[in-house]
Amino acid sequence: MEITDVRVRKLNEEGKMKAVVSVTFDNEFVVHDIKVIEGQNGLFIAMPSRKTPEGEFKDIAHPINSDTRNRLQSAILKEYEKAKEQEAAHKE
């Protein structure tokens, strides 16, 4: 499965959630609401999730192996950095 598009839909400077992203695979399937989060060890992605009645968050869709997760995270963070640079350039 190839990542064919990454769209950074919302950028936040405040708080730990830095962006909301949509990713398209093979120009046929899209996953919305992937979050870019700033953690203690840097940026990471959080897949779309829902809250259970017990208060736990369960992923709705997620990679099932670490290689795919790493490729997805790399592609998202690359586009996030581009979007941040473009936003900074517009502010100048």
Swiss-Prot record:
Signal peptide: none annotated. GO terms for biological process: division septum assembly; sporulation resulting in formation of a cellular spore. SUPFAM superfamilies: SpoVG-like. It comes from the Bacteria. Keywords: Cell cycle, Cell division, Septation. The keyword Membrane does not apply. Could be involved in septation. Belongs to the SpoVG family. PANTHER family: SEPTATION PROTEIN SPOVG-RELATED (PTHR38429:SF1). This is Putative septation protein SpoVG. It comes from Thermoanaerobacter pseudethanolicus (strain ATCC 33223 / 39E) (Clostridium thermohydrosulfuricum). The gene is spoVG.
